[in-house]
């Protein structure tokens, strides 16, 4: 469903329907934020696990930072012209990487996306997502919400 709102926001943007684009973009972001929280409930779907694994491979702070940056690059900008070649649908990555990047695309600063990506990759990351207390109930609620 978020993909549908996103595609419509892109179409609205191309046709200069600013308010419609903003509305569809906000619906995209709202759904993605819910998905991010839901995925935080499972350790296999969290950026936190990937970053910790990379950082634990280093022995010095400089090594840890470099390993973290390399790990984040692999799942974001690695692949050159094949954008999002190794993309993952993980909690933390959705909230802290994909959503801000999408929002930046819809601003007049589209040419700054690569610069923003590099800054995100090379900056230390910390988890700020709180999982749902009851992920099953949250999933059912999300399904109901998207079927309206």
Where do the language-model regions lie?
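Catalytic domains of carbohydrate-active enzymes that cleave complex glycans
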Residues: 1-148
